[in-house]
Amino acid sequence: MNQCGTITAVFEFEIKQRDGRARTATFQTPRGAVTTPMFMPVGTQGTVKGISPQELLEIGSQMILANTYHLMLRPGEQLVKAHGGLPGFTAYPGPFLTDSGGFQVMSLGHMRKISEEGVVFKNHLDGSRVELTPERSIQVQEALGADVIMAFDECPPYPAERPYIEASLDRTVRWLERCHAVKTKDDQALFAIVQGGVHEDLRLKSLEATLPFATPGFAVGGLAVGESKEEMYPAVAFTAGRLPENKPRYLMGVGHPEDLVAGVALGIDMFDCVYPTRTGRFGYALTDDGRLNLNSSAPRTQLQPIDAECDCYACRHYTRAYLAHLLRAEEMLAPRMLSLHNLRYLHRLVERMRVAINGQQFHPWAADWSERYFHGNVPGWFTSAFERSTQSEI
């Protein structure tokens, strides 16, 4: 069932250091090596909103996520292919990951219909009928030319009945087999996605059916879709602890600072989320002291930067008062600078975690970070995640 063939050498994953379940590694791709743990900014339409490729490189971005669903519908994958793929189309020269389009299609609710063949949905742009199947998803992703592509899966909503989740994960495995069968390019790594909701036995069933495909990496899917942290993190710990040690582990759609720290503790290597840019556009900045609301009254007269410890352009040049003024004046520079800062904050966060892991100091570092971030009220789910992180992986 292993159809990876020659790509295993191209996509080498080398662990550098371990500290409990947390680990640092190098993941080699055709467009260069990335170091993990890492956070991937989301460029839904082929751009990280408001941020240029040069700025992404300057703040430490290593791999960008692009969205198959949106790019398939507009401008169409063939136009992207005509540019030589996503790097030529976007002018970002580094590695890309494309999602399969499954999550966006599943989010359409009544506008889509799922069958064994795939998903039929209404194009949100013009109302036309569109069909997305495992074969079509791979075809589009090969045209987009990302380094890492995702298997087409069904992400059940939360809450969902257990029989539905089980039927869904069974279908996801069958779709994975079809993705494998039609994949043609050796310079793209196909990652499989483990589903099962918050049910450990269903997660185990998904793992047992998915692991034999021996893909170059594995994703933990179907989480951060509305369940509580208390439900989510036992599922993360259970799944990550049973994934291959020598393959990258990707927790999909997760990007809050506390989630990155807890996820890394449990052995996760890769994260993505729109959170840092979306929250920046709404006037919020991420810091080690929690989220700073620049819409509130206090920052309007504060002459310090967002974060004195941050080296992003906004923190090196602007005061909180100036950025708060720009927000009130509805100037586009404000959401741009806050998005830039928030992305740099998450990149700095994983950089600091890599340093701590390499120095065998991850748990003391995380204890200090969480005490400050949560202002002394560290939530139980976070503490429990770290308790699980000291247990041996199964």
Curated annotation (Swiss-Prot):
Binding site for substrate: D99, S100, G101, G102, F103, D153, Q195, G222
Cofactor note: Binds 1 zinc ion per subunit.
Protein name (database record): Queuine tRNA-ribosyltransferase
SUPFAM superfamilies: tRNA-guanine transglycosylase
Keyword Glycosyltransferase in annotation: yes
Family: Belongs to the queuine tRNA-ribosyltransferase family.
This protein's UniProt keywords: Glycosyltransferase, Metal-binding, Queuosine biosynthesis, Transferase, tRNA processing, Zinc
Function according to Swiss-Prot or TrEMBL: Catalyzes the base-exchange of a guanine (G) residue with the queuine precursor 7-aminomethyl-7-deazaguanine (PreQ1) at position 34 (anticodon wobble position) in tRNAs with GU(N) anticodons (tRNA-Asp, -Asn, -His and -Tyr). Catalysis occurs through a double-displacement mechanism. The nucleophile active site attacks the C1' of nucleotide 34 to detach the guanine base from the RNA, forming a covalent enzyme-RNA intermediate. The proton acceptor active site deprotonates the incoming PreQ1, allowing a nucleophilic attack on the C1' of the ribose to form the product.
PANTHER family documented for this protein: QUEUINE TRNA-RIBOSYLTRANSFERASE
Cofactors that this protein relies on: Zn(2+)
Species annotation: Deinococcus radiodurans (strain ATCC 13939 / DSM 20539 / JCM 16871 / CCUG 27074 / LMG 4051 / NBRC 15346 / NCIMB 9279 / VKM B-1422 / R1)
GO CC term (a single one): cytosol
One Pfam family recorded for the sequence: TGT
GO process annotations (BP): queuosine biosynthetic process; tRNA wobble guanine modification; tRNA-guanine transglycosylation
Taxonomy of the source species: Bacteria, Thermotogati, Deinococcota, Deinococci, Deinococcales
Entry annotation: catalytic residues: D99 (proton acceptor), D272 (nucleophile)
Record's subunit section: Homodimer. Within each dimer, one monomer is responsible for RNA recognition and catalysis, while the other monomer binds to the replacement base PreQ1.
Residue span of region RNA binding: 253-259, 277-281
GO MF, one annotated term: metal ion binding
Catalysed reactions, semicolon-separated: 7-aminomethyl-7-carbaguanine + guanosine(34) in tRNA = 7-aminomethyl-7-carbaguanosine(34) in tRNA + guanine
InterPro entries: ArchSynthase1/Queuine_TRR, TGT, TGT-like_sf, tRNA_ribo_trans-like
Domain of life: Bacteria
Catalytic activity, EC: 2.4.2.29
Top-level EC class: transferase
Annotated Zn(2+) binding sites: C310, C312, C315, H341
